[in-house]
A protein has these predicted regions:
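Conserved ABC ATPase "signature" region
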Residues: 117-134, 409-427
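Catalytic Walker B motif of ABC-type/P-loop ATPase nucleotide-binding domains
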Residues: 163-166, 456-459
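Conserved ABC transporter NBD signature motif
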Residues: 60-72, 358-366, 375
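Conserved ABC ATPase signature
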Residues: 138-142, 146, 431-435
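Helix-to-loop junction immediately C-terminal to a conserved catalytic motif
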Residues: 52, 350
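The feature captures the beta-strand-to-loop junction immediately N-terminal to the Walker
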Residues: 37-39, 335-337
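Conserved ABC ATPase "signature" C-loop
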Residues: 217-218, 510
Length: 574
């Protein structure tokens, strides 16, 4: 029985020159768990917003076709009715948290509907979402993953049959990402909820989803069972979808005639080991670690301590005696679980947070009495949410803002140069908050380096991005050496870490527990376990097959385990 029926749906936003959705047809069965995939801008979020009535009742435009969700025609219904049929957790889920305490927030929607049992519904939803026992806590005491679960609980409290989540794990560490998906699986299997996720992380799709819907250029290309969908490597890559690394490794081995082609490519670790387990690694991946850096120290943390004070007066210590040196020219990845202190460390370097004890030196000078606006000439922070970088009504004005405020005579010429460099000339008059994810990232980077800082800090620069946009951001990071020599990123993206970083710093509960190269970090099981990080899937596959194999990318795995296989004519960098 279909719980969602979409027929010949076409939609264009007001003033848009072309349709965002084009003749979409889709049916989803009750109790299904579906991943919707496609490149940035293909219409995934727009399609989902037609299911809960946000389109066309709130966001108007050119709309034709029909959408039926849980036996209700969306166009003919009211949002108040649809909210109890279709629950939606948005990509910017923090905006769905509206009350100061956990139970108040979880039961708020039910209270708005004047349900007499609103508190009971809130408690039930919290239990279903793994937040039992957190009822009296303040929302700012929750971790990122718990906050996301609270947004989900607020939706679940209304007991909708359909749940939609837009990029549910984009900014979460592996532990919280697993927790989110385990909760979703329980809601699907135990409570019969039909779940749709918009997702770029195909390894989670492989583990949890039953079907995959591929969107391209505003229409649905196909809907297939997950294993079959993820085996269509070339088709997915053409839409900028990165299949699981296990799948890509097998695909490349088949292309090189190292193994015979299976009926379906593996998408899980178990299937990958079964198919590739007989191979032998003949060379290790080359570690790109910088080793002992000899360049000058540009930032020094000397016995730094930082605490936050909660509403009830209790102090929470983030750092206690932190000591660390950053050298000129380093490409550093800062990794660790949510709450480990990554963002706090970056804010200390920019002066947005001041240490309670110890000192921070920038090129030998204490930053204790320096204001953030003074430090911004030398240290620039690009925020996790790129929209937070936009304060004017156009990208051009945002890029020029800091330079104009500091009376730089060449601000106009430099703004044009940055627009050209970051391929933003055609977008220069657009409001940055209305751009696509990749365009926002490029624009925020241009703003971040406008003052030629010596140190560039980026918080989760590849979150919410498809493979093409992610590669574009990585290329940009490598291309700005002439402007900014020292770059530090805080990230949960271990593929980015292994492909880009020269030095990896691991934080755990406010302490640096490891600092070194890829081999030194991922080759130490104790560091991996204690920090909660998860090595790239391809690294784990290599280790399962051969304990001394250190392969951090699919390319390294193929070179190491490929033996005397033939190089394909259409070699692609995957």
């Amino acid at each position: 029985m279909s719980i969602i029926e979409i027929k010949h749906l076409t939609f264009a936003y007001p003033g848009a020159e072309k349709n965002t959705l084009n003749d979409v047809n889709l049916e989803i069965e009750k109790g299904d768990f579906v991943a919707i995939v496609g490149n940035n801008g293909c219409g995934k979020s727009t399609l989902c917003k037609t299911l809960n009535g946000l389109i066309p009742h709130f966001i108007t435009g050119s709309y034709s076709g029909s959408v039926v969700a849980d036996q209700v025609n969306v166009q003919d219904s009211e949002i108040g009715i649809l909210a109890r049929k279709v629950g939606y957790v948005y990509q910017d889920f923090e905006n769905q948290i509206v009350r100061p305490t956990v139970l108040d927030d979880a039961s708020y929607a039910c209270m708005n509907y004047a349900m007499p049992d609103y508190l009971e519904r809130g408690r039930k939803a919290l239990a279903q979402c793994g937040l039992e026992g957190k009822e009296k806590e303040y929302i700012w005491q929750l971790s990122g993953g718990q906050t996301h679960l609270l947004a989900l609980a607020g939706v679940v409290s209304l007991e909708p049959e359909i749940l939609i989540l837009d990029e549910p794990i984009a900014q979460l560490d592996p532990h919280h990402a697993d927790l989110i998906y385990k909760i979703l699986r329980n809601l699907n299997e135990k409570y019969g909820k039909t779940i749709l996720v918009i997702e770029h992380h195909t390894e989670y799709i492989a583990e949890y989803c039953k079907h995959v819907v591929l969107m391209k250029d505003g229409h649905v290309e196909w809907k297939k069972r997950t294993k079959e969908a993820l085996s269509r490597v070339e088709e997915l890559q053409s839409c900028n979808i990165f299949p699981p690394q296990v799948t890509l490794a097998a695909y490349e081995m088949v292309k090189r005639n190292v193994i015979p082609k299976p009926e379906l490519l593996p998408s899980s670790m178990e299937d990958g080991i079964n198919l590739l387990g007989g191979l032998v690694c003949q060379q290790r991946g080359n570690d790109t670690g910088a080793g002992n850096f000899k360049h000058e120290k540009i930032v020094q943390f000397k016995n730094v301590s930082v605490s936050y004070r909660a509403v009830k007066g209790k102090a929470y210590k983030v750092f206690d005696g932190l000591g660390l040196d950053i050298h000129k020219g380093e490409k550093i990845a800062l990794i660790g679980s949510n709450g480990a202190g990554k963002s706090t460390m970056m804010k200390l370097m920019t002066g947005l947070i001041k240490p309670l004890e110890g000192e921070i030196l920038l090129k030998g000078r204490s930053v204790k009495d320096m204001r953030p606006e003074q430090l911004s000439r030398e240290v620039s922070l690009v925020y996790q949410n790129p929209e937070d970088m936009f304060i004017k009504d156009s990208i051009e004005a945002d890029i020029a803002f800091a330079m104009k405020e500091r009376n730089q005579s060449d601000w106009e010429e430099r703004a044009q140069s940055l627009l050209k460099r970051f391929r933003l000339l055609e977008l220069k008059n657009r409001d940055g908050r209305l751009l696509s994810g990749g365009q926002m990232r490029r624009a925020s980077l241009a703003i971040g380096i406008a003052l030629n800082p010596e140190i560039l800090l980026l918080d989760e620069p590849t979150a919410n991005l498809d493979i093409a946009t992610r590669k574009e951001i990585m290329k940009t990071l490598n291309d700005i050496k002439d402007i900014t020599e020292t770059v530090m990123i805080a990230t949960h993206d271990m593929q980015l870490v292994c492909e880009w970083a020269e030095r990896i710093i691991v934080l755990c509960q406010g302490q640096v527990i490891a600092d070194g190269t890829r081999d030194e970090i991922f080759g130490d099981p104790e560091v991996v376990k204690r920090s909660g990080i998860r090595p790239p899937e391809i690294f784990t596959l290599g280790q399962e097959i051969q304990a001394d194999a250190f392969c951090y990318t699919v390319d390294e795995f193929v070179k190491g385990f490929g033996g005397n296989g033939n190089e394909p004519d259409d070699e692609k960098n995957v």
